[in-house]
């Protein structure tokens, strides 16, 4: 099953008021790095079953630099509240961030790494994480890499800066998450999340009514 995620930039706490309108998605990603300060956890806790909290590092595609010590403390508090978050693999290792039942991610914005490089970066998180997430720039070799990564059981893969239909294609092939924007792209190559949801719902209905269409 692929979960549809509506990615929402949070520049101020007023943006949190948009969450209820996005709950037709499976999850709402709160991109807290769009602000220079982090909201009080109790403000978002009421949505804990439907949100993914992301404080993306600038070198992995984030917007504003958040003090790493503050980010680490915030993520640890989120863990205590059982709130799902997405943390970069290297940040989790450096600051000993809890990753059990969380999303552990890695982003390659300017090159396509080898499979072994990606696997070694994520190896320690395979068993305990909720999902692994790998995003790779759409340069030579990215399709082969992402397809190979889909052999892992709990993984979401996404190409960056390519035709949005490719994200749909990787979802069909087994990627567990597809991110869409909620009016403002948070990554190149995103559909609006409602469009992504409509396409996947349609493909699911086809596969149920006529399985041979998608399976051959």
Swiss-Prot record:
It catalyses: 3-dehydroquinate = 3-dehydroshikimate + H2O. Its EC number is 4.2.1.10. GO terms for molecular function: 3-dehydroquinate dehydratase activity. Pathway: Metabolic intermediate biosynthesis; chorismate biosynthesis; chorismate from D-erythrose 4-phosphate and phosphoenolpyruvate: step 3/7. 3-dehydroquinate binds at residues 7, 29-31, 56, 167, 186, 190. Keywords: Amino-acid biosynthesis, Aromatic amino acid biosynthesis, Lyase, Schiff base. It comes from the Archaea. GO terms for biological process: 3,4-dihydroxybenzoate biosynthetic process; amino acid biosynthetic process; aromatic amino acid family biosynthetic process; chorismate biosynthetic process. It is an enzyme of class 4 (lyase). The keyword Calcium does not apply. CDD domains: DHQase_I. The keyword Lyase applies. The active site is at 107 (proton donor/acceptor), 133 (schiff-base intermediate with substrate). HAMAP family: AroD (MF_00214). Homodimer. Belongs to the type-I 3-dehydroquinase family. Involved in the third step of the chorismate pathway, which leads to the biosynthesis of aromatic amino acids. Catalyzes the cis-dehydration of 3-dehydroquinate (DHQ) and introduces the first double bond of the aromatic ring to yield 3-dehydroshikimate. This is 3-dehydroquinate dehydratase.
């Amino acid at each position: 099953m692929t979960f549809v995620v509506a990615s929402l930039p949070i520049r101020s706490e007023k943006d949190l008021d948009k969450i209820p309108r996005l709950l037709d998605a499976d999850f709402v990603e709160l991109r807290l790095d769009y602000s220079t300060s982090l909201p009080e956890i109790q403000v978002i806790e009421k949505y804990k079953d439907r949100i993914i909290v992301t404080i993306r590092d600038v070198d992995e595609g984030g917007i504003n630099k958040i003090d790493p010590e503050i980010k680490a403390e915030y993520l640890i508090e989120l863990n205590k509240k059982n709130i799902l978050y997405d943390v970069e693999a290297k940040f989790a290792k450096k600051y000993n961030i809890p990753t059990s039942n969380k999303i552990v991610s890695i982003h390659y914005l300017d090159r396509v790494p080898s499979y072994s490089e990606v696997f070694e970066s994520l190896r320690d998180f395979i068993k305990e994480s909720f999902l692994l997430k790998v995003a790779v720039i759409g340069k030579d070799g990215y399709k082969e890499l992402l397809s190979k990564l889909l052999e892992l059981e709990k993984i979401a893969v996404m190409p960056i800066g390519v035709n949005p239909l490719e994200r749909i294609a990787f979802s069909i092939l087994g990627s567990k998450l597809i991110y869409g924007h909620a009016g403002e792209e948070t990554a190149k190559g995103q559909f609006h999340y409602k469009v992504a949801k409509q396409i996947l719902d349609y493909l699911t209905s086809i596969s149920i009514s006529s399985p041979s269409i998608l399976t051959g």
